[in-house]
Amino acid sequence: MDRILTKEEKQALISLLDLEPQYWGDYGRMQKCYKKKCLQLHPDKGGNEELMQQLNTLWTKLKDGLYRVRLLLGPSQDPNASTSTSRPGEFYNPDTGGYWSYSYGSAGYSDQQKKYWEEFFSKWDVNEDLTCQEELSSSEDEFTPWHPNPPPSPVSISSDSSSSSCDEEYPRNSSRKRKRVHANGSPNTPIQPNKRAHTPGGGRTTIRGDTDIPRTPARESQSTFGSYFNSTEELEEEISQTQQSHHNTTPKKPPPTVSPDDFPTILRGFLSHAIFSNKTQNAFIIYSTKEKCEVLYEQIDKYNPDYKGIFIMKQTEAFVMFMTPGKHRVAAVKSYCCKFCTVSFLLCKAVTKPLELYNCVAKCDDFQILKENKPGLYHFEFCDEKKEVKQIDWNFLTSFAVENELDDPLVIMGHYLEFSQCESSCKKCAEALPRMKVHWANHSQHLENAELFLHCKQQKSICQQAADNVLARRRLKVLESTRQELLAERLNKLLDQLKDLSPVDKHLYLAGVAWYQCMFPDFEMMLLDILKLFTENVPKKRNVLFRGPVNSGKTSLAAAIMNLVGGVALNVNCPADKLNFELGVAIDKFAVVFEDVKGQTGDKRHLQSGLGINNLDNLRDYLDGSVKVNLEKKHVNKRSQIFPPCIVTANEYFFPQTLYARFHKVYNFEVKDFLAKSLEENSYMGRHRVCQSPLTMLIALLWNVPTENFDKSLKEKVETEKKVLSDMCNFTTFAEMCLNIQRGADPLEAL
């Protein structure tokens, strides 16, 4: 075994195993020390990685060397086996004339193995006899006779017999006997049990026959490695049997204590049971023995705890609870504490309710508070007196946008910024103008929410969300409602606006109706036909063309109808590659108007040519309304829908037959000078855009169309407004308005 490792490696291994030099060769003891040191030096247990690697390297080299030595072992038999008087398990050495024991028992003995052992025994110093000095007890019962068939055991060979520990006290009842071997090769004659040798003076001589060989740990280790086995399992089994036989007189060890695998049930409700979580905490509790908790109480100062305390349970187990100013992972805290707990158990968990846990420990009789760095934990240390911060109500702002059909985020933001002002000093609320109804009707309700909105950092996001909410509700309504219902809802809102107008304003809008009556004698029938086409929306029978010279009233009438039904105006005179986003404006609209479309001039040299008519000719599937088309806006996904019906206004351009066939109604406009003169005489109609107002179209319907033609849901309001109009202006007054217009005078002249 000494030839397997060098002297330096041997000393290093003994140092790493914390083993005394005299136990070198005691494989069982060395293996036990190796396992113990593995627990201490393993990196996962907080040990030194370099020392662990060095220990593993030396231990592996030792085991491999022992294995190779065993492979070289083999039996040697007595040349006169039939006449040999040696006991079983002993063999004759022809070079020295001595005997030695064996216990490996392997069959076959090669020349190479024989040569190895000849070199090994040549180093023995056989000139000096092996002796053992000891005094036997006077009692005859204490003498142990030689057994004729002792169990085979290897001879312990020592280079210095005087340095052996024969003078020490050892148990006398050892079951293993050794026979002394003389240099002449003949064993001593065994002494009989009742036979003793005496000195001439009557003294007792030292018996030099069978003696009890002291079994010190050092001799035990030498004896162990003096014999070789066929396998590692036999070696370990022999070691365990040998150790047990030499410790029969020692008291039995108490049964090992079972370490707890979890915290007590009373504390589990205050702890975090997450195992694989990386969440950081600032309160922890450690469960270990009382002695280790006292050590850990001092070691956790590394975390600068604001509070730490030891709680004792059952006088043997304890807990260390501590709270840190910073946050740490449970695994990191446990790994640090495990460095100080090589044998003792240790459990570590995060505390989710530190105050409740402390109160539970303080009140429970099973626990005792051993020490603390400060006198306890109190409720005020965990309570922050924070003022309740009010936040803006997003839903309330959204309801304001939905009620007033505001789909522009900037408009919503502007209203709410004005709502934040004091209501008593608000001019809009003081004037209470009908066109400012959105403001003065909602100022008082949204004042408090608007003040919070004023200091909010997410104003644009809130308004954008409200606008999206309006668009979402509108799209859903378009999908679920019929076009008759949509038109009725639109007229209902206009009736509410008409109700708020003053009599003077109503006279002004009634003059606009008279203005259109002078443009087309059957204006009411024309308006009803257009509304019918838009409402029924029959493919290829839904589009209208307004065609005529400049300043004939095409754009004014088209704009008034679009405002009545809730449509938009589009420009198709742009290049074809820009049409997609222009057409996307028509998403979810009731109708559209292609305003002032240009085309080929033909014989009209005074007109400018353009791409509008050519682009419309390429949009036949849009105009027909037979199939769904893809409409898109910037930053919005494409949407497939039937393109809404349209009104096309154009001058006297050439229309190809493929495009002209898409219009179900064509109205030719003419220039009437008196219409322009009457508008010049009444500046109010121009400034307030009476001719383009939806209220003008609504009053035209109320004035000319019977109540039965309106939707049932509108009849009550229609009858009320009809009565108001008839009381305010009779047919004679209306006829005078028409006469004034035809004369080119102010429609309200002398009225």
UniProtKB/Swiss-Prot annotation:
**Residues binding Zn(2+), per UniProt:** C426, C429, H439, H443
Question: In the record, which positions carry N-acetylmethionine?
Answer: M1
Q: How is the cofactor bound?
A: DNA helicase activity requires Mg(2+).
Q: List-wise, which residues carry Phosphothreonine?
A: T249
From start to end residue, where is composition biased (Low complexity)?
155-165
Q: Please list the residue ranges annotated as the SF3 helicase domain.
A: 522-682
* Positions carrying Phosphoserine: S245
Signal peptide location? none
Per the record, which residues fall in region Disordered?
133-260
Name its co-factor(s). Mg(2+)
Instruction: Reproduce the free-text note on domains from the UniProt record.
Output: The J domain is essential for multiple viral activities, including virion assembly, viral DNA replication, transformation and transcriptional activation. The LXCXE motif specifically binds to host pRB, RBL1, and RBL2.
Q: Know the name of this protein? A: Large T antigen
Q: Which organism is it from?
A: Hamster polyomavirus
